[in-house]
Amino acid sequence: EAVDRAAGYLSDAGYAVAAATTPSVDDCAKAWFRYLGAELEAFLMPLAREHGSETIQQIFEWYFEMGKTADPVDYRLGVKNRSAMTRQWNEFLQDTPLVLAPYFLQPTPDWDCDQKSLAGIRDVFNSAIYSTGLNWVSLPAGVTPIGMIAGRPAGVQIIGRRYREDMVLD
């Protein structure tokens, strides 16, 4: 609903808005989770264990329970695959320089949903695939509020070409 509402606003403002099939967002999000997890485990977790609150330590524990993170060999393959995914997106964005996408695939969750349960944090990551996945392939995105949906504030994001943040912000 948020994307449709934003598309209407953009169309009313004179922008050409058309449906398009993008490269896989889901594959990018899964890769982000698996390979960023390896970086978190190696570099951030020692600090979180030493200095982090019980809440943040629990959130990280649930994060690592959600799936397997990469070992060093798998991580190198993941970085290689990231280059291929980035290329697919770059090629797509040559003809479609901006993409209107949801920020969450569900209504905005409670502010503390990631602190409540493994299921809650899983729901957040599963519904935020456009954010995490496109972060994995280093695409700029601007998030903007679109109003209230289902009694919650909602937003969309405009995704652009690499190094063309100016187009996202225009």
Question: Each predicted region: which residue ranges?
Answer:
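Short, surface-exposed loop/helix-turn segments at secondary-structure junctions
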Residues: 77, 108-128
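Gly/Ser-rich, acidic/histidine-flanked active-site/gating loops
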Residues: 1-34, 69
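Short glycine-/small-residue-rich Rossmann-like dinucleotide-binding loops
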Residues: 104
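An anion/phosphate-binding loop that grips the pyrophosphate of nucleotide cofactors and donors
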Residues: 96
